[in-house]
């Protein structure tokens, strides 16, 4: 190992040892002795479409499965703003970057067992990520590897020893560590068939699978053999499926729920809940989620660039913030803007872009573009099918988009689809235009760019493709100088907006609610990464 590589490894090892110690004493600053026992009552907005997280693009299975599994590394549960500095060990005791961020070596814990009693080894890690990246020699295959593109830069995953794993990369990529810390990146048991894991969890996490009653609830129970001593504190967790928004809110206000789902509460709902139950703790957080419009560029009329641009110009972004989110959102383009994130375009620059200059000006231009394409008054009528999920948060967006389209002469019929049909339809590109919500695994450009905008990505639902943008995406991913990387990232966002790659309405503020007796459940600035629950306890 060279001197520079040794220095990186030494710093990294030091960091992981310190944070491993912190894992055992997260509560010291609070000055309270945790109480053991009790079942946390939480909620899901829909029945999980399945329990395999790597096949998923929805929080509806990530959230209830997070307590059941473990990652190599994870984001510190008590630090709400995630970064490389908040990544802590989980199944790995420590890690080391080598060869200028081309090789990432993990040294694994030796006292870990799967919930069925089998030992955890490096073979499980290699299996998980070979399947996730669809390696040619992978021993199994997901129905859909939802984030396959996260792992496109991984050349090989090696398991030279039972407790050592090496990720070999094609080029430097510091963000790989953050990807591995995401709630979308649990490690699976190599000895359990994927078909079985679609129905139940066999993990290494703090809670074991108890029961999944379809359409009703998912229940977990304490894992007495969890590898972190004295954890978890809870006896179990119950996630009750309540699909209707008003019924969920009523259950929270009545105290039948201890904590609300980290999604689906608008600012108006949060205000109403607080008024009804003044002791509720409600946190306003950005969770790296955007409401947006997806356009199928292979289907008329959206195969015409002028029509796509007209759609983007038609959207009144400030109107969306007020009417759909009741003030609980900020306007932004390709990445979460300040103050919620750190990578987005500045507000002064946004206001100079078409679609962000003011509703009246932009709608006039939208009508002109439609007319130039032969549509509108005196031309062909435009009737489209606007697809979306049956969830309230999606229907709110779809209704707004349909109204905005109507104002420029496009008549949209909303087609509702449940999640089990929605994601396969998008994967087949079996839609015309969609009202969509996109949430990133963490606040880093790689989390958004690779899966949503790279040519050929499975979650690039519009089939947007610009080879120059692809080149810039790869370039920013391996840039180690933060200022230089930010410059590249801002340029990519400008190009995405110019190309109408995925018209953004805005970036959501979420309102996370729980009662004061719920301790150590801290919402993060990414939706998927704080549901492990090993440190949560009930003060009652």
What are the functions of these language-model segments?
Residues 69, 73-82, 152, 173, ...:
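Gly/Pro-rich hinge or "lid" segments in bacterial periplasmic/extracellular proteins
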